[in-house]
Amino acid sequence: MVQILDGRSVSKKILQEVKDKVAKAGFPVKLATIYNEENEGSKMYVGMKIRRATFAGLISVEYKVDNSWKTDDILRLLSKLNMDSSICGILVQSPLGDGIDESKIFNAIDPLKDADGLSAFNQGLLFENAKENYIVPATPAGVISLLEAYHYQFAAKNALVVGRSVLFGRPMSVLLTNRDMTVTLAHSKTPVDQLRQFAKRADLIVVAIGKANWFQFTDLKKDVVVIDVGANKLNGHATGDVDFEKVYPHVSQISPVPGGVGPMTIATLIKHTFDLAVFQQGEQK
């Protein structure tokens, strides 16, 4: 029987754990979020994050930008937030707008306030497999937490990651490599015949290509686990990158869309913010 990897239930446990820790911490935990209020998708997603952050006991502060803002305007705002000792975590919701250099924005976030783990500093520590405290990009970290919640054994298995973005695919492949998996990183330019062969050999398949129902392969290992990171709209409905109905009968475990990786990303962001707050408290003593 196929098992659904329920990100909603796992994320609720993470949020409750954070809530309990915040209640005992004795100091406020504040998350600052920057987003473009003219982007409806960003408004909706930020609203979800703020509701869950509030549940977990965090203080949320919104900083709204619009299409008139330039990269330098946002950099000035970030500089103020970096210097504000009351801010524990900073989240920049992409996309910010046309012409905004988002790489420059992410790298301007103080690494000790980088709740999403997207700065070059934190990504560098990930690639180095550093042992000291650092923040892993939230979505890949959420995938790992989801798999761990279902007691997935990583070592000595084959993984296929489809999607090579700096925000997800590349850090995901490194996280799996650091857990002793043999990882193939494929992308939109990988020939379909090659991709089919990679999928056939994989024990774990993680798909983040940004196209609704794109992954439709069915010639898979009988015990394969499929993680769908897609967040698309199709006919008004949230749809993943994996054709769920087609692939479902051919796997042992699969994450749904919605209700899989999305809630895990949000819970991870909130956990990161608390972890950063604890670290900052130690630095101030």
UniProtKB/Swiss-Prot annotation:
<dbReference type="InterPro" id="IPR020631">
    <property type="entry name" value="THF_DH/CycHdrlase_NAD-bd_dom"/>
</dbReference>
<feature type="binding site">
    <location>
        <position position="188"/>
    </location>
    <ligand>
        <name>NADP(+)</name>
    </ligand>
</feature>
<keyword id="KW-0511">Multifunctional enzyme</keyword>
<feature type="binding site">
    <location>
        <begin position="163"/>
        <end position="165"/>
    </location>
    <ligand>
        <name>NADP(+)</name>
    </ligand>
</feature>
<keyword id="KW-0560">Oxidoreductase</keyword>
<dbReference type="GO" id="GO:0005829">
    <property type="term" value="C:cytosol"/>
</dbReference>
<dbReference type="GO" id="GO:0035999">
    <property type="term" value="P:tetrahydrofolate interconversion"/>
</dbReference>
<dbReference type="GO" id="GO:0006164">
    <property type="term" value="P:purine nucleotide biosynthetic process"/>
</dbReference>
<dbReference type="InterPro" id="IPR036291">
    <property type="entry name" value="NAD(P)-bd_dom_sf"/>
</dbReference>
<dbReference type="InterPro" id="IPR020867">
    <property type="entry name" value="THF_DH/CycHdrlase_CS"/>
</dbReference>
<protein>
    <recommendedName>
        <fullName>Bifunctional protein FolD</fullName>
        <ecNumber>1.5.1.5</ecNumber>
        <ecNumber>3.5.4.9</ecNumber>
    </recommendedName>
</protein>
<comment type="pathway">
    <text>One-carbon metabolism; tetrahydrofolate interconversion.</text>
</comment>
<keyword id="KW-0368">Histidine biosynthesis</keyword>
<dbReference type="GO" id="GO:0004477">
    <property type="term" value="F:methenyltetrahydrofolate cyclohydrolase activity"/>
</dbReference>
<dbReference type="GO" id="GO:0004488">
    <property type="term" value="F:methylenetetrahydrofolate dehydrogenase (NADP+) activity"/>
</dbReference>
<feature type="binding site">
    <location>
        <position position="231"/>
    </location>
    <ligand>
        <name>NADP(+)</name>
    </ligand>
</feature>
<dbReference type="InterPro" id="IPR046346">
    <property type="entry name" value="Aminoacid_DH-like_N_sf"/>
</dbReference>
<comment type="function">
    <text>Catalyzes the oxidation of 5,10-methylenetetrahydrofolate to 5,10-methenyltetrahydrofolate and then the hydrolysis of 5,10-methenyltetrahydrofolate to 10-formyltetrahydrofolate.</text>
</comment>
<keyword id="KW-0521">NADP</keyword>
<dbReference type="Pfam" id="PF00763">
    <property type="entry name" value="THF_DHG_CYH"/>
</dbReference>
<keyword id="KW-0554">One-carbon metabolism</keyword>
<keyword id="KW-0658">Purine biosynthesis</keyword>
<dbReference type="InterPro" id="IPR000672">
    <property type="entry name" value="THF_DH/CycHdrlase"/>
</dbReference>
<keyword id="KW-0028">Amino-acid biosynthesis</keyword>
<dbReference type="GO" id="GO:0009086">
    <property type="term" value="P:methionine biosynthetic process"/>
</dbReference>
<comment type="similarity">
    <text>Belongs to the tetrahydrofolate dehydrogenase/cyclohydrolase family.</text>
</comment>
<dbReference type="Pfam" id="PF02882">
    <property type="entry name" value="THF_DHG_CYH_C"/>
</dbReference>
<comment type="subunit">
    <text>Homodimer.</text>
</comment>
<keyword id="KW-0378">Hydrolase</keyword>
<dbReference type="GO" id="GO:0000105">
    <property type="term" value="P:L-histidine biosynthetic process"/>
</dbReference>
<dbReference type="InterPro" id="IPR020630">
    <property type="entry name" value="THF_DH/CycHdrlase_cat_dom"/>
</dbReference>
<keyword id="KW-0486">Methionine biosynthesis</keyword>
